[in-house]
Each structure stands twice: as structure tokens, then as C-alpha cells.
Design a protein with these regions (language model features):
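Bacterial Sec-dependent N-terminal signal peptides
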Residues: 1-25
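Conserved functional acidic sites
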Residues: 21-221
Length: 221
């Protein structure tokens, strides 16, 4: 009987370990929480700096986003309560604080990060403060320069697509982020009605461009 319990315990531990190892969140999320991001203005000059960190309170985990402007003055802070569920990091409560508008608490179900499925993109829909987004996570290949070193890497590309109408005019906002193992999110682009710019960039990133799998295999050699 004792051997049966030990065997059952070992099998349960193996199953738990297999599930835990299926998605390596620590390779993408924890590096992201230790990085500094620069946001340029329309002329390419530094507009603000964003820093991320993690906190645990009681049995809850939080991702803290702090935006600084000027001489180190905090202009906004967002606290995301989050959990991991299957292939995604999900926030179910957000506390948004702004120096001008005060604090507002939201309970939107937002996916902060998601792994693609093994052989196809992972897709979902979400509502962020009343705006509806169609989202996709997929594997792509990139050439990026980090710390002035050119690297060819497999990355996760996450897009959030929001189409809306003002009056009779149609508008579209497309957010595109690239995530890399051991670095987290390295850059986010925002395309507003066809005008694309980098809205948030890892401070150690020099450049990044998406390449084909054929180019990746050729250049990686």
C-alpha cells in the first residue's frame, strides 16, 4: 500500500512538472518585469520612461507599471493583479492612477501575454476600458540588435487590433509587440490609421526587424 501511494505521488508530481514546463513564463515575463522602456515623441525625442516590477501581497500577484516624465516625475501608475492560466498571463483587476485624473479601478479580463499554440496562432478577444480588441499571438523570426550585438531570434508577436467609428469615419489602432526569451517584451509599435511608430522600446534595443523563416535559417548558420 505504501509503495502504491509513493508511486501515485510520483506520477502526480510528474504530471504537475510536465504542465509547469510546458510554458516557460519565467523566460518571458520575469525579464520583462526588470526592464526599462523608452517612449519617443513624434520627433523621436525621449518623451517618457516606463519601468515594471512585481509585487506579491497575501495570495495575489501584481505587475506594477510606472511612467516617468521630466526630471523623474511619476505621471501614471497601473497595478495589474494577475495569474497564469494555461498558456496566458491574465489580469482580472487593474488600478490605474494618474496625477491629473486620479485613480480608477477596472475589472477587465486582459491577457498581458500569451504563448501561441504549437503549430498555429492563438487568438482571443478582450475589452479594455470599453474598447474591444481582437488579439493574436504567433511565432515569428526577427533580427534585432541588443547591446549593439546583432541577433537572429525566434520571437512571439502579439497584436491587438481595435477598429472603431467616430461620426461616419472609420478608424483603426493596431498594436504590435515583440517578445523574446530572456528579454521579455522588446518593443511595441502603434499603427494609428496607417501612421506607425514605436510607442515603447527596450532601452538596450538598437533596432529590430521581422524576417522570414528562410532568412532566419540562412543567417543563423
Amino acid at each position: 500500500m505504501k509503495k502504491s501511494f509513493l508511486l501515485l505521488g510520483a506520477m502526480m508530481l510528474l504530471v504537475m512538472s510536465t504542465k509547469a514546463q510546458k510554458y516557460n513564463f519565467e523566460d518571458y515575463i520575469y525579464p520583462f518585469g526588470c526592464r526599462t522602456y523608452a517612449s519617443p515623441d513624434s520627433k523621436g525625442n525621449l518623451s517618457s520612461v516606463t519601468q515594471y516590477s512585481f509585487e506579491s501581497q497575501a495570495f495575489d500577484n501584481y505587475l506594477i507599471e510606472e511612467v516617468y516624465i521630466g526630471l523623474g516625475m511619476m505621471s501614471a501608475k497601473t497595478t495589474y493583479r494577475y495569474r497564469t492560466e494555461e498558456n496566458a498571463v491574465i489580469s482580472d483587476v487593474q488600478l490605474r492612477q494618474n496625477r491629473l485624473t486620479g485613480s480608477t479601478r477596472y475589472q477587465d479580463k486582459l491577457i498581458l501575454f500569451a504563448f501561441p499554440e504549437k503549430d498555429k496562432p492563438f487568438k482571443w478577444s478582450e475589452t479594455d476600458r470599453g474598447d474591444k480588441y481582437q488579439c493574436t499571438s504567433e511565432y515569428v523570426y526577427i533580427n534585432a540588435s541588443i547591446y549593439h550585438k546583432s541577433l537572429f531570434m525566434k520571437a512571439i508577436k502579439i497584436t491587438r487590433d481595435n477598429s472603431y467609428i467616430v461620426g461616419k469615419e472609420k478608424h483603426r489602432i493596431l498594436e504590435t509587440s515583440y517578445w523574446v526569451s530572456n528579454y521579455g517584451r522588446i518593443i511595441t509599435y502603434v499603427d494609428w490609421d496607417g501612421t506607425k511608430k514605436a510607442s515603447s522600446k527596450l532601452d538596450i534595443l538598437d533596432y529590430v526587424q521581422e524576417i522570414s523563416e528562410e532568412e532566419y535559417n540562412k543567417l543563423k548558420k
